[in-house]
Amino acid sequence: ATEDGKIYNSDNEEPTVLRSTAYISAQKDPDKLVGFTRQNDVLLAFGEWTTEQFYDAAVASPASFMGRLDQGTLQVGCAAPDSIVHQEKNVFWVGSSKTGGFTVQMLDGVSNVQRVSTDSIDKVLNAEKTSITSANAYPLRVAGHFYYVLTLSASNRTFVYDIDEDRWTEWQSGSSGRFKYVSSDEHDDGAIVLHESDGTICTFDITVYQDNGSPIYCILQTAPIDRDTQHNKTCKRFELYGDEQTSSATVDIQYSDDNYKTFSTARTVDMQYRSWLTGLGKYRRRAWKCTHTANTPLRLEGFEEEFQEGAH
């Protein structure tokens, strides 16, 4: 394919035979061709702000065998060619349109296109500005869940969409920065990923809770909580609850009373037993932060806080 929209094809059953006349043009809008992929029985041609669809029209050689599916043109294009991911029945990509801004789009079938990014994700995407063109994505299927793994170069962050849960999370290698694996494949019925610089190939093992021997930082952080009043609150007890583990599975608990500027010294609870913290001081608005780095499973349901409201 060429940037001006020409999509060439080889002769039928002759992949090495290319003819200068065997092409069809993506020309519904005057945007540049960015990339393409296959979805069901159509070819998706992504422009800067539109996406056209082509099908096998059985046109005889030397012309292109393809025909345009006119009613299938989507009014959203692609901002980053390496963000295009085909997963079974869906296609994901970082979209752009004439109205401006970047979003993550999902195409189900050939006509049901929808935005799956949240306002928070869109804010980070738009902060990339022209660097959005270098965004990279790949698919993962682990433990029955499909993930769209999207890395942004300018912000040095990786965001992951779980299609089954309709939920976004952020992945890192170590305690900060992006997830440093750039592509995925399948091997022995499991997912494998390739490291961006040293060529290490790792497998996803749902019984191992480390990143190639290093801790995985699982961090849960709440928004500031005021209990619907600006009165002082005395926190008497804080308890996490979730799955009870068969071995020690510690979680560090911290809190911030100044909008994340500073956090308290970490104190530890163990999910092997029912345990809680006491003597947690006073606050008007408090954000909680829970950090798990042990090589153990963790599944939390929530937390319980016992507090006493003051008069002022």
Which residues does each predicted region cover?
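Beta-propeller and closely related beta-pinwheel folds
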Residues: T2-N136
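Beta-sheet repeat architectures centered on beta-propellers
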Residues: T73-V91, S96-H312
